[in-house]
Amino acid sequence: MMSLGLVGRKVGMTRIFTAEGDSIPVTVLDVSDNRVTQIKTVETDGYTAVQVAFGSRRASRVTKPLAGHLAKAGVEAGEILKEFRIDAAKAAELSNGAVVGADLFEVGQKVDVQGVSIGKGYAGTIKRYNFSSGRATHGNSRSHNVPGSIGMAQDPGRVFPGKRMTGHLGDVTVTVQNLEIARIDAERKLLLVKGAIPGAKGGKVFVTPAVKTKGAK
């Protein structure tokens, strides 16, 4: 599914109240200053897409090739460039320098949000995979946080790939699907998305229309 999306910054979490008094936990996303830097077409690039810049970056931190690319579009450098595959009809409605705002979405719409999860560093199997710990007492000595056996015998004589073991936890790309847009603050260019999304405060996220809306609650 080819749809235009937005690049945003995770501001944090709060809650809002419905007219009936129900409390809804929401994540606030700043989606200001999404500006088009390039329109790709089948004729020039072999496919149709739009490239969007988000945030700001000092000119001294921009490479010369990128500076030339942005100057051609007539936009200032951003922290991040993101490409969205779209159809030709939608691409024809956009132009270099155009600003894509929060009004791209509507209240109640289902969206997919992609971000980088918070890094936890090196973690054991209890924290990483919710393994059970060893017994605290009753003869157990220095085996409280061990994963247990990781293999079998001389046959097969190896540890199978994918075996859940200790290692780095977090700091991976995570996509949460079918989140609902609870409120849109067009004046402050904010999206309030129901529920939690990956990443720490200040992290960059990508918001796109949901691709698996059938049967979504």
Swiss-Prot record:
SUPFAM superfamilies: Translation proteins
An annotated Gene Ontology molecular function: rRNA binding
Processing and modification events after translation: Methylated by PrmB.
PTM sites of type N5-methylglutamine: 154
Keyword Ribonucleoprotein: yes
Keyword RNA-binding attached: yes
Gene Ontology biological process terms from the UniProt entry: translation
InterPro entries (alphabetical): Ribosomal_uL3, Ribosomal_uL3_bac/org-type, Ribosomal_uL3_CS, Transl_B-barrel_sf
Any matching Pfam family: Ribosomal_L3
Key words, A-Z: Methylation, Ribonucleoprotein, Ribosomal protein, RNA-binding, rRNA-binding
GO-annotated cellular components: cytosolic large ribosomal subunit
PANTHER family tied to this protein: 50S RIBOSOMAL PROTEIN L3, LARGE RIBOSOMAL SUBUNIT PROTEIN UL3C
Listed HAMAP family: Ribosomal_uL3_B
Physiological role: One of the primary rRNA binding proteins, it binds directly near the 3'-end of the 23S rRNA, where it nucleates assembly of the 50S subunit.
NCBIfam families to which the protein is assigned, alphabetical: L3_bact
Family according to the record: Belongs to the universal ribosomal protein uL3 family.
This protein's name: Large ribosomal subunit protein uL3
Provenance organism: Burkholderia vietnamiensis (strain G4 / LMG 22486) (Burkholderia cepacia (strain R1808))
